[in-house]
């Protein structure tokens, strides 16, 4: 905003757009034990207890299985980033996205060039020591209506974590390296659908339909088992996940980060 080549009118226009993107939503009164709750703090505590009860994870003392390492896969133990990569990641942040500290995606996009250099230096120093700042792990949880059920019931809402912008950019760098490592070394099965570029659950659905029709044509019996893991992302067994990462040769400061 200190760029004086931008007119005052243009600066004011940018500020208005930034303010316009700051949208806040409220949860209607909740009914708990036949009592209508309107106090925001009490509603927050109700959601906190409910979401926490649905996100239990295995004990940290549970020992993961002893998995043999894949010696044919090269080790992924360090990484570096660059201002160009950071700027690219920032450009992909949705402009309407707001972090819990109130920084919008639009604002980050506007200052992407001057901050990319400093950000890449910071990230590279963190990668060298294998450290992920504790403050970046703290998320603000907001309750989002599922579009099903009574709006007065806590069970009709799901939790959404709003992380700091720096945390999300840092995670994006790690994700790109880990995904590339898995793809280049055929770690991910070709039956995986979604979470991959150029693939989606639509492809998986087409595969299932094709398999069913092909077997019908030759009078074969078709059987399928569908599993739905409730709150899967909230119940990640971290010790088991680390064991799996070790198995595919992810270690060193990359794993520590």
Residue map of PLM features:
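Conserved catalytic palm subdomain of right-hand nucleotidyl-transferase polymerases, strongest
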Residues: 94-103, 152-162, 203-246
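Short, glycine/acidic-rich hinge or "gate" loops at secondary-structure transitions
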Residues: 1-6, 186-195
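Conserved short loop/turn motifs at secondary-structure junctions
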Residues: 103-111, 192-197, 226-232
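Active-site palm subdomain of RNA-directed nucleic acid polymerases
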Residues: 174-192, 222
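Generic structural signal for well-ordered alpha-helical scaffold segments
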Residues: 11, 16-17, 179, 209-214
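Acidic/histidine metal-binding catalytic segments
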Residues: 251-257
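Surface-exposed loop/turn segments and immediately adjacent short secondary-structure elements
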Residues: 9-155, 161, 165-169, 185, ...
């Amino acid at each position: 905003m200190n760029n004086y080549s931008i007119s005052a009118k243009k600066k004011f226009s940018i500020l208005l757009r930034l303010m316009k993107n700051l949208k806040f939503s409220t949860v209607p009164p909740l009914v708990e034990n036949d009592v209508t709750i309107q106090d925001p703090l009490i509603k927050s505590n109700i959601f906190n207890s409910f979401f926490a009860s649905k996100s239990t994870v295995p004990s940290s003392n549970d020992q993961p299985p002893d998995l043999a390492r894949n010696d044919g896969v090269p080790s992924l133990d360090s990484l570096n980033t660059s201002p160009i990569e950071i700027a690219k990641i920032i450009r992909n942040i949705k402009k309407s996205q707001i972090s819990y500290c109130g920084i919008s995606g639009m604002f980050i996009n506007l200052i992407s060039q001057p901050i990319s250099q400093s950000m890449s230096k910071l990230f590279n120093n963190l990668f060298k020591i294998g450290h992920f700042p504790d403050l970046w792990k703290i998320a603000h949880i907001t309750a989002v209506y599922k579009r099903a059920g009574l709006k007065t019931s806590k069970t009709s809402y799901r939790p959404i974590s709003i992380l700091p912008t720096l945390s999300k950019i840092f995670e994006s760098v790690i994700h790109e390296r880990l995904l590339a490592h898995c793809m280049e070394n055929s770690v991910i099965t070709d039956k995986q659908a979604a979470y991959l570029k150029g693939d989606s659950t639509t492809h998986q659905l087409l595969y299932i339909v094709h398999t069913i029709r092909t077997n019908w044509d030759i009078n074969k019996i078709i059987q399928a088992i569908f599993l739905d893991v409730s709150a899967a992302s909230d119940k990640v067994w971290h010790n088991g996940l680390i064991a799996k990462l070790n198995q595919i040769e992810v270690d060193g400061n990359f794993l520590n980060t």
